[in-house]
Amino acid sequence: MPTYALLGATGATGSAILRCLLASPPPDLDLNILVRSKQKLLKSFPTLTTTISPRIHIIQGNSTDTIALQQCLEDASVAFMCVADNASNKGVSLTADTVTAIVTTLGMLRKLHGSAYNAPTILQLRSASLNPKLSCQVPRLVYNIVSFCLHYSHLDIVKACEHYEAAAAKGLLSYIYVDPPTIHDAFGPNRTGHKLISCKPDVCDKQETALSYADLGAGFVEIASRKEDFLNQPVGVTATGKAKETWGVLAGFLFDGAKGRARAWWEEERPMSKPQNLFLYCVMVSLAAVVLVQYTGTMNR
């Protein structure tokens, strides 16, 4: 009787995973769901209160609350880690803070269960931008733009990954990094097909530039069912059909990230006058606007 844990089920990724599990649940599955707002979850998924398969257990609490995490992770063989912050601002740490709390909680569970403790496999949403074997397929200009704009979000994820790897070395958990390309059509239910990309070869299979959240959710569920194939390594997800592309939303995230970089620069103490800093701020934001056009244009070719 497997138990899965889903951390964050009201965002686009967590919702997509939940829809997939509800549509085709593994046999005899228990599903523990940790959310900040049970009311918000049930508004999106009203049938959860009457769902028989899988068996649903909803835990309301913060992702850094070890008591809530213990309830969610108890007996879990797989945990889908979907807690993240879309804002790429200096100091963002939600993902790393959550992973720190997860590691602390697993340490508590191992102490509680002793030799009967079974280390779960954590599936962490990452990004193809952080996977050299996948990011090398992206034009360098586009890669540099994305890395610049999402710098602080990427730092948060990198720190989280360092926590995973240290915990895995101690036998507390195994991890799998799930690396999609650009993700589109948040909360859209329609799947068009996906394929997993092994990152073991020196040269990976081609990754398409656009993937729907629905197909990403299905990819997560497939990885969970094949976790032994990908333990402690990254795996790419790519589309096999035509995703509904929502470049305007992604451009907004990149633009906000560029503003976050400029804001951090503005706030640093530098031997520049305010007019000079204001000029630099305007240049950076204008550059971000120009390169976003280049980014979306390149991706649509």
Curated annotation (Swiss-Prot):
Pathway(s) annotated for this protein in UniProt: Mycotoxin biosynthesis
GO molecular function: oxidoreductase activity, acting on the CH-NH group of donors, NAD or NADP as acceptor
Glycosylation-annotated residues: N62, N86, N190
Broad EC category: oxidoreductase
Name this polypeptide is given: Averufin oxidase A
First and last residue of the signal peptide: 1-23
Keywords: Glycoprotein, Oxidoreductase, Signal
Task performed by this protein: Averufin oxidase A; part of the fragmented gene cluster that mediates the biosynthesis of dothistromin (DOTH), a polyketide toxin very similar in structure to the aflatoxin precursor, versicolorin B. The first step of the pathway is the conversion of acetate to norsolorinic acid (NOR) and requires the fatty acid synthase subunits hexA and hexB, as well as the polyketide synthase pksA. PksA combines a hexanoyl starter unit and 7 malonyl-CoA extender units to synthesize the precursor NOR.
